Every structure is written in C-alpha cells, then in structure tokens.
Amino acid sequence: MDNGTATLERVEDTLQLGSRLGEQLRAGDVVVLTGPLGAGKTVLAKGIAAAMDVDGPVTSPTFVLARVHPARQAGKPALVHVDVYRLLDQHGADLLGELDSLDLDTDLQDAVVVVEWGEGLVERLAQRHLDIRLERVMHSDVRIATWEWVRTTGDDAECSAEEERCR
C-alpha cells in the first residue's frame, strides 16, 4: 500500500477512500485516524469496515471505547474500532491496558484495529501503523486526507517506499 493524498469533496468520497484502504489491510494492522471533530474519521472507518465485510453498523464508539465487528467470512480478520477521545485528557493514558480491561472477544493480532484520536497513544499497540490524517478545508465541506505507514519503534522513522508495509 502506497502513501498518498486525496481530496474528499463528498461523504461518498470518504467512504470510497476507506474502502480502497480497507481492501489492503490484514490481520495485525493498526490504523490511526487523526483529525478535528467532524473531519470524517468515523465515515472513513465505515468505508474500511465495508471493504472488510464485517458485521454490525460502524458508529462512533466514543462512550464504549471500542467495538468489535466480527468478519462475515471465515479466515478473514475482525475489525476492532476504537475511539480514545475521552482518554485524551488523561496524561499517560495506557491504551493497551484500557483495551485489555474491556475483555474484547478477539485477539488484537487477529484483527485490524482502527483507532480514532490515537496519535501519541497507539505506539504501544504496534511496531508500525497506518497514519491517516483528515483535515477540513476552511469554509468548505471538502476534506484533505493523507496517509502513510509509520514505524513506531527505533527512531520512529517513516517507512520508506522500498519497505513492504514497514516489515
């Protein structure tokens, strides 16, 4: 999966981008969605879920922290949709500890984990992650999305194009 940028003029564009990215994700992948309130993070997660063909409606899990969406097909990964917005004010929040305390019905290594508001916290979940940033164009409904695989170990260097998904 290459790094990239897209202009998203409609909600459908955001869903399509999520679907395109979701088709390439596999078990053990971690995706971080970053952007201001209303930028389209949950809409993008819906597109990822649609491509992965998982059960259940994808809604913002803000008040429950995480939702597990099982795969409809055997052998395919589940989607764990996490929203850590309410943890942002807690200095030193332990995302992994919070997820462990939820007793999720799936092993995170067997799922694709999509984390809204996870910047600065997700590094404890994986050695690398797909960083997707959504920004709103002022006085417009247009969003700009950028995405790249980022290594979260060592010197925190971004993945080079030659490295297959930072592995």
Language-model-derived ranges and their functions:
Residues 54-69:
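Short beta-strand-centered segment that lines the nucleotide-binding/catalytic pocket of NTP-utilizing
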Residues 23-28:
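Phosphate-binding P-loop
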Residues 31-33:
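Hydrophobic anchor at the beta1->P-loop junction of P-loop NTPases
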Residues 41:
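Conserved lysine of the Walker
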Residues 2-5, 90-167:
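Short phosphate-coordinating micro-motif centered on Lys-Gly-acidic
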